[in-house]
Regions:
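Glycan-recognition surfaces
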Residues: 1-68
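Short conserved micro-motifs at the rims of enzyme active sites and ligand-binding pockets
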Residues: 40, 133-135, 157
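Aromatic- and carboxylate-lined catalytic core of secreted/periplasmic carbohydrate-active enzymes
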Residues: 54-100
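Structured loops at beta-to-helix junctions and adjacent beta-edge loops in soluble globular domains
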Residues: 58, 125-127, 148
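Carbohydrate-binding surface patches
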Residues: 102-141, 172-178
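Short, exposed beta-strand/loop patches in secreted or surface proteins that constitute
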Residues: 111-114, 153-159
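Solvent-exposed beta-hairpin/edge-strand motifs
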Residues: 137-152
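C-terminal beta-strand-rich structural cap/linker in extracellular carbohydrate-active enzymes
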Residues: 156-179
C-alpha cells in the first residue's frame, strides 16, 4: 500500500457477503485505499442501493454489466457516485468506528462508520434482518441524523437516548446516514 493507492478488498461476488467485508475492512486497510467492488447484477432497486452502500465509505470500484441497468438502477448508481465525490475527503481524513463491533458472517445486521470532526457517516446493512438498533456514542451531542443515500430515505429511523433505530423496507437492505 505504500507504493499503490488501491487495494482490492475481495473477489467476493455475493453482495451480502461483501457487506461483511465492507463493515470490517477499515480495521486492516485505510478506507480510501480499500477498493470495494460495487457490481449490481440484478436490476432491483434495493440490490443496487445495497451494492452502492458497500463501497461508499471505502473506495468504490464499479463493475458488472451496468449498461443493462434500468434507468432507475442507473440513476441510483449515479447518485451514489456523486455522493461519494462529495464525501471522499471525509472518508480519506476520517477515522473508522464500529458501533456494533466487528461484524461476523452470521450477523443479521452490520454497521460501519467514518467520523471526521463534526461529521460522521454510518453505513447500515441488514443482510438477514429488516430492523436494527445501533448504539451511538460520540464526544459531542448528536444533533441530527439523516439518510443521505439514497436521497429518498426509503426506510424508517429514529434516534433517541443514544440509539439509532432503523427499520428497512425488507431484509437485505442498506442505507448510508450522516450524523
Amino acid at each position: 500500500l505504500e507504493l499503490l493507492s488501491l487495494q482490492s478488498t475481495s473477489d467476493q461476488t455475493d453482495y451480502l457477503h461483501n457487506s461483511h467485508i465492507a463493515a470490517n475492512v477499515a480495521s486492516a486497510v485505510t478506507p480510501e485505499q480499500a477498493g470495494m467492488w460495487v457490481y449490481p447484477y440484478e436490476d432491483n432497486e434495493e440490490h443496487v442501493i445495497y451494492n452502492m452502500v458497500n463501497g461508499l465509505l471505502l473506495r468504490p470500484y464499479i463493475s458488472g454489466m451496468v449498461w443493462k441497468m434500468s434507468d432507475t438502477g442507473m440513476k441510483r448508481m449515479q447518485e451514489g457516485i456523486a455522493l461519494y465525490k462529495e464525501i471522499r475527503s471525509d472518508v480519506r481524513d476520517g477515522v473508522p468506528f464500529f458501533p456494533l463491533g466487528f461484524g461476523h458472517i452470521r450477523d443479521e445486521a452490520l454497521a460501519y462508520g467514518i467520523i471526521n470532526g463534526d461529521v460522521a457517516y454510518l453505513a447500515v446493512f441488514t443482510p438477514a434482518a429488516d430492523e436494527v438498533k445501533i448504539p451511538l456514542t460520540f464526544e459531542k451531542e448528536i444533533v441530527e441524523v439523516s439518510v443521505i443515500y439514497p436521497k429518498e430515505q426509503l426506510c424508517e429511523y429514529s434516534y433517541e437516548n443514544g440509539v439509532l433505530h432503523v427499520k428497512m423496507p425488507q431484509k437485505a437492505a442498506a442505507r448510508l446516514f450522516r450524523i
